[in-house]
């Protein structure tokens, strides 16, 4: 899946380089399309086709109420921010402070294509692959093992150290939600909300504030012109802080239940059987190489 998608991305990258060399302007939406198209239109279909050949476990679906859904959602916030801090610090440390998050270039693009990919397409396809396809096939070896493996593969899939840790943490919550409900709509909706908050609302609020104008601004006109933006941004930031604190409390107090299975792997054999096989090793090595390339770029 990854190799086919990256191969197509390289071809599109050569096309992009050729256009730039010939002084042809490339809009942000086209760059976004070149990045997303190979993975979601080529890599994922191949991945789904391969996974179909692996027997899966079908379990009864269980519903959750709105209150529990909201509680699980806000548990993602402290995990997301803590993971983001770890990923950013580690990226800066390993690159000598030179690394930049490639995703930032696209998040401030206001094209409808970005919203479609980030908020709709990515959550649906990623949850279908990393939650349903993987967990349905691995949960018989232990629910904890399946969730951890799913989250690890999900984190590596981003091939971006800035995103790796918070993707892993959020993947644990989404994996738990899917494992307990076996209903994909809950994890998809959570994923959509998280991506909407980080990929649409946050860039929109930041772009509504003219930071350059406010730097050292002493005149009242400059302050007044940004006042509404600051009020909205501050209210949103305060709400996130409150919800993040609530998420920490819920994480500490909520009991997470895991059911045992007949074929559950013994503790001493889990890592060897799950992560030390040829497929997992090749996938991990490939993603790590791409992460290193991204840091060095």
Q: What are the language-model segments listed below?
A:
Residues 10-22, 85-96, 197-214:
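Membrane-helix interface motif
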């Amino acid at each position: 899946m990854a190799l086919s998608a990256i191969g197509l991305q390289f071809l599109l990258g050569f096309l992009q380089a050729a256009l730039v060399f010939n002084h042809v302007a490339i809009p942000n939406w086209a760059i976004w399309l070149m990045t997303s198209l190979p993975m979601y239109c080529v890599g994922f279909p191949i991945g789904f086709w391969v996974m179909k050949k692996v027997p899966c476990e079908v379990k009864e679906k269980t519903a959750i109420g709105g209150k529990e859904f909201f509680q699980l959602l806000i548990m993602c916030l402290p995990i997301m921010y803590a993971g983001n801090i770890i990923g950013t610090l580690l990226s800066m440390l390993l690159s000598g402070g030179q690394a930049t998050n490639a995703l930032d270039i696209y998040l401030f693009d206001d094209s409808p294509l970005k919203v479609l990919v980030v908020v709709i397409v990515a959550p649906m396809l990623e949850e279908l692959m990393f939650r349903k396809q993987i967990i349905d096939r691995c949960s018989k070896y232990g629910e904890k093992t399946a969730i951890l493996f799913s989250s690890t593969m999900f984190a590596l899939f981003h091939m971006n150290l800035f995103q790796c840790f918070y993707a892993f943490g959020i993947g644990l919550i989404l994996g738990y939600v899917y494992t307990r409900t076996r209903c994909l709509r809950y994890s998809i909706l959570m994923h959509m909300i998280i991506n909407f908050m980080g990929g649409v609302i946050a860039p929109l609020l930041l772009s509504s504030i003219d930071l350059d104008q406010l730097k050292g601004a002493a005149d009242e006109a400059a302050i007044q012109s940004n006042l509404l933006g600051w009020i909205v941004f501050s209210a949103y930031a305060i709400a996130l802080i409150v919800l993040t604190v609530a998420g920490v409390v819920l994480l500490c107090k909520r009991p997470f239940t895991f059911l045992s299975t007949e074929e559950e792997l013994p503790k001493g054999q889990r890592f060897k059987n799950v992560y030390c096989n040829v497929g997992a090793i090749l996938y991990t090595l490939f993603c790590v190489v791409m992460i290193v390339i991204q840091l060095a770029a």
